[in-house]
């Protein structure tokens, strides 16, 4: 525990808080060509590369990912959730925060069903997470 004299000399400092999705905390003023500190829940970007990568040690799969250049000029790696996708280079996508635990360096998710990204086909449960519309009722 500090003495009164030590507190007078140095005082207490706040803990430094670090963002888990830093690219969403930067904006870009295109008129002044300057970066701004404006946070956003999602950001739009253009795919520069779409591919697959393998996860960390105990898991085994081919996880789909896209390299995305955001509107603020930052390029990030984002995970494509769900089974099957229609993304290719130059597709316009919406990204949100949220890491993928077994893919190092992937801190963002692509939002399915927004902009150029199609929803997951034939999905019946958890549709809102994968951008799938409600199926039409079958005729009797």
UniProtKB/Swiss-Prot annotation:
Annotated InterPro entries: NA-bd_OB-fold, Ribosomal_uS12, Ribosomal_uS12_bac
Q: Name one GO biological process term.
A: translation
> Has the keyword rRNA-binding been applied to this entry?
yes
A GO molecular function annotation here is: tRNA binding
Question: What job does this protein perform?
Answer: With S4 and S5 plays an important role in translational accuracy. Interacts with and stabilizes bases of the 16S rRNA that are involved in tRNA selection in the A site and with the mRNA backbone. Located at the interface of the 30S and 50S subunits, it traverses the body of the 30S subunit contacting proteins on the other side and probably holding the rRNA structure together. The combined cluster of proteins S8, S12 and S17 appears to hold together the shoulder and platform of the 30S subunit.
Quaternary structure?
Part of the 30S ribosomal subunit. Contacts proteins S8 and S17. May interact with IF1 in the 30S initiation complex.
Identify this protein by name.
Small ribosomal subunit protein uS12
């Amino acid at each position: 525990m500090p003495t009164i004299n030590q507190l007078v000399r140095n005082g207490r400092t706040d803990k430094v808080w670090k963002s888990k999705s830093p690219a969403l905390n930067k904006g870009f003023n295109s008129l002044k060509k300057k970066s701004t500190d404006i946070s956003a829940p999602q950001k739009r970007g253009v795919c520069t590369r779409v591919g697959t990568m393998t996860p960390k040690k105990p898991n085994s799969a081919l996880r789909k990912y896209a390299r995305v250049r955001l509107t603020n000029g930052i390029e990030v790696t984002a995970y494509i959730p769900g089974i099957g996708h229609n993304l290719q280079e130059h597709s316009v996508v919406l990204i949100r925060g949220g890491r993928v635990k077994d893919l190092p360096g992937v801190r963002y998710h692509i939002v399915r069903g927004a902009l150029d990204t199609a929803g997951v086909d034939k999905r019946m449960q958890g549709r809102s997470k994968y951008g799938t519309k409600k199926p039409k009722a079958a005729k009797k």
